[in-house]
Amino acid sequence: MKLRWLLILVVFLAGCSSKHDYTNPPWNPEVPVKRAMQWMPISEKAGAAWGVDPQLITAIIAIESGGNPAVVSKSGAVGLMQLKPSTSGRDVYRRMGWRGEPSVSELKNPERNISMGAAYLSILENGPLAGIKDPQVMRYAVVVSYANGAGALLRTFSSDRQDAIDEINDLDADEFFEHVVKKHPAPQAPRYIWKLQKALDAM
């Protein structure tokens, strides 16, 4: 009986440790970044229009699609920056004062996809994440929100948005990352920050 409980404990602890192993499976950014860099002229134009760092846009392209504009995920995310028509796409349309949502063919167009992706990053930074003071913390918060939603991130701090922002402002970038590792319900969240940094370092 003791042996059985020992085995259960070992399995449980192994599961806990693997939950936060955001470095597995390994990810080599070299090829995805190289392919994403071919879209840099468009990323620079979109970044200038929306006040978004084109290197951040390029890193997200590398992570999301590896630079392939025709990719459609199982969840329905489309194109270089893997935008979902009914969520991020609809948010951008609303921000532009347009009705409806973008079509799949529109999101497969590199210029339209990157423009809308940059717009969505701006919406996150100037909307639910507005008030975060540290630029590196903001960058981490933006990409986690891009991948998993701003609400999911803010709720790991507080159910009140302003209280959550205040708590975030008490952290530096490393402390914010550790919080995401420990508190965010999506294993993808810390992994996204890790991949972002690897992509930026590879540029």
From Swiss-Prot:
It is an enzyme of class 4 (lyase). The keyword Zinc does not apply. GO terms for cellular component: cell outer membrane. This is Endo-type membrane-bound lytic murein transglycosylase A. It comes from Klebsiella pneumoniae (strain 342). It is found in: Cell outer membrane. GO terms for biological process: cell wall macromolecule catabolic process; cell wall organization; peptidoglycan metabolic process. It is a lipid-anchor. GO terms for molecular function: lytic endotransglycosylase activity. NCBIfam families: PRK15470.1. A lipid is attached at residue 16 (S-diacylglycerol cysteine). It holds the Pfam family SLT. A lipid is attached at residue 16 (N-palmitoyl cysteine). The keyword Cell wall biogenesis/degradation applies. Belongs to the transglycosylase Slt family. Its EC number is 4.2.2.n2.
